[in-house]
From Swiss-Prot:
One of its GO terms (cellular component) is cytoplasm. This is Probable RNA methyltransferase sce3898. Residues 90-329 form the Radical SAM core domain. Disulfide bonds join C97-C353. It comes from Sorangium cellulosum (strain So ce56) (Polyangium cellulosum (strain So ce56)). S-adenosyl-L-methionine binds at G157, E158, S212, L213, G214, N294.
Length: 393
C-alpha cells in the first residue's frame, strides 16, 4: 500500500504513513513499540488495519558458475514461485527478476513456465515481497552497500495478463518510502498483449518495456508463441511504438535463438528489416537482445519442428552454435542493426532465462489448469491497510 492510501484508510498523518510504510518494508513487520519518529496512535491505527503478510523462502540456490541466485518462495495457498537475483555490471548492484503469476497460460515453446499452465495471478504484495526478501538476503550475504538497483518482470508468468496488480506493484516498488527503485530501472517483459502495453504507457510511462519475439515470421512465431494467433506481431508492434513515444525509451526486443528454427540468415534479414521499419515509423530504434536457448524440460525433450509437424527431428537439439550466432549477428550488422547477446547466467541451478518453473499446489489437484501437452498448441511488504496486508502493495 502506498503512504497516501494508508493515511486515507487509517485516518493518520501522511508523514506518519510514510514512516510506517518505510518501517514495514525495512523490517518486514511493524514494531511492538513506536520509534521516536512515529506517533504511537498512528502505529496502532496501522496495526489494527491489517496484518503483515509475507512469503516463505523454501529454497535458495546459488550458481557455482556466476553470481546468480535463484529463490523459491511458497505462497499462503501452498503454491510456489521462483525469482532470481541478477548481478549488474557495476559492482554491488543487482536486479531482481520477479514472477507475476503462478504458471502461465501462453505456452511459449522455449519457456518452462509455459509448460505449467496457469494457476493464478499474484497479488501486488506478493510481487513486491519477492523484491523485499531478495534485498534482505542481499544484505545478509553480500552486505557492503550492495543493493537491488532494478526489477525485471521476466520471471514466471505474463506480467500484462496481470496488469492491475503489476502496475500497483510497480508503484509500490518505486515509492521512496517503500523500495525506492527508480521506475526507469524497472522493465516489464511481455509476449505481446497490446492492451497491457498501452496501460503501461498511460499509467507508468517511465517503466521500460521488453518484448519477446520468438520469430518475426508469422508462421514460425505462431508455432513458437501461440499468443501470436490472438495478437499478431503487427498489432503488438503498434502498441510498442505508442509506448516508445510516450516513454521516450527504446523498447528491448528479446529474440530467443533456436537451432534450425529461427536462426537462419533469412530469419536475421527479416528481423533487421522489421527493426529498421520500426525505427523509421516511430523514430526510436529497438534494442535487440539475442538469447541463446536455455534447456528446459527433460534432457532431449524436443521443441516444435520448423514446419509445425509432430515429427520434430532436428529440433531435438535446439542449441545454437557460436558460429551460427556470429553469422546471425553479422547479417544484422550488415543491415545497420546492432545487437547484443544476453548472458543468461545461473543455468546450473535452473535460473537462466526461460528456465523458471515450479509445480503448483493447484496444478497438482484435479481441476488445476495445465499447459497443453506440447508447445505450439493453441493458447489463448505486503500492504498496510484494511483490504490488503501491511507491507508493499
Amino acid at each position: 500500500m502506498l503512504p497516501e492510501e494508508l493515511a486515507g484508510a487509517c485516518g493518520i498523518d501522511l508523514t506518519d504513513a510514510r514512516r510506517i510504510v518505510s518501517l514495514a518494508h525495512r523490517l518486514g513487520e511493524l514494531p511492538a513499540r513506536a520509534p521516536a519518529t512515529v506517533r504511537r496512535a498512528a502505529l496502532d491505527a496501522a496495526r489494527s488495519a491489517g496484518e503483515i503478510r509475507t512469503l516463505a523462502l523454501v529454497e535458495r540456490r546459488a550458481s557455482a558458475e556466476d553470481p546468480f541466485v535463484k529463490y523459491a518462495f511458497r505462497l499462503e495457498d501452498g503454491a510456489t514461485v521462483e525469482s532470481v537475483r541478477i548481478p549488474l555490471e557495476r559492482p554491488g548492484r543487482y536486479s531482481a527478476c520477479v514472477s507475476s503469476q503462478v504458471g502461465c497460460a501462453l505456452a511459449c515453446a522455449f519457456c518452462a513456465t509455459g509448460r505449467m499452465g496457469l494457476t493464478r495471478n499474484l497479488e501486488a504484495w506478493e510481487i513486491v515481497e519477492q523484491v523485499r526478501l531478495i534485498r534482505r538476503d542481499l544484505d545478509a550475504t553480500v552486505g557492503g552497500g550492495a543493493r537491488v538497483h532494478g526489477v525485471l518482470f521476466q520471471g514466471m508468468g505474463e506480467p500484462l495478463a496481470n496488469a492491475d496488480r503489476v502496475i500497483q506493484a510497480i508503484r509500490v516498488l518505486s515509492e521512496p518510502s517503500a523500495q525506492a527503485i527508480d521506475m526507469r530501472n524497472i522493465t516489464v517483459c511481455t509476449a505481446g498483449l497490446p492492451s497491457g502495453i498501452r496501460r503501461l504507457a498511460a499509467e507508468v510511462p517511465a517503466v521500460r518495456l521488453g518484448l519477446s519475439l520468438g520469430s518475426v515470421r508469422p508462421g514460425k512465431r505462431r508455432l513458437l508463441m501461440p499468443i501470436d494467433g490472438a495478437h499478431p506481431l503487427e498489432e503488438v508492434l503498434a502498441a510498442v511504438g505508442e509506448h516508445a513515444r510516450a516513454s521516450g525509451h527504446a523498447p528491448m526486443w528479446a529474440y530467443t535463438l533456436l537451432a534450425d528454427q529461427n536462426d537462419t540468415d533469412e530469419d536475421a534479414a527479416c528481423l533487421a528489416a522489421l527493426a529498421r521499419g520500426f525505427a523509421a515509423q516511430h523514430g526510436i530504434s529497438p534494442r535487440l537482445s539475442l538469447i541463446p536457448y536455455n534447456a528446459i524440460g527433460a534432457p532431449g525433450d524436443p521443441l516444435p519442428s520448423p514446419d509445425g509437424g509432430d515429427e520434430r527431428g532436428a529440433s531435438a537439439d535446439p542449441f545454437v552454435r557460436s558460429a551460427r550466432l556470429d553469422a546471425f549477428r553479422a547479417v544484422l550488422s550488415a543491415a545497420g542493426v546492432g545487437s547484443i547477446v544476453r548472458y543468461s547466467g545461473g543455468g546450473d541451478v535452473g535460473a537462466a532465462c526461460g528456465q523458471l518453473a515450479r509445480p503448483s499446489a493447484e496444478a497438482q489437484r484435479p481441476g488445476g489448469r495445465r499447459a497443453p501437452p506440447r508447445p505450439g498448441a493453441t493458447a489463448g511488504a505486503a500492504d498496510v491497510g484494511p483490504s490488503a496486508p501491511p507491507r508493499p502493495a
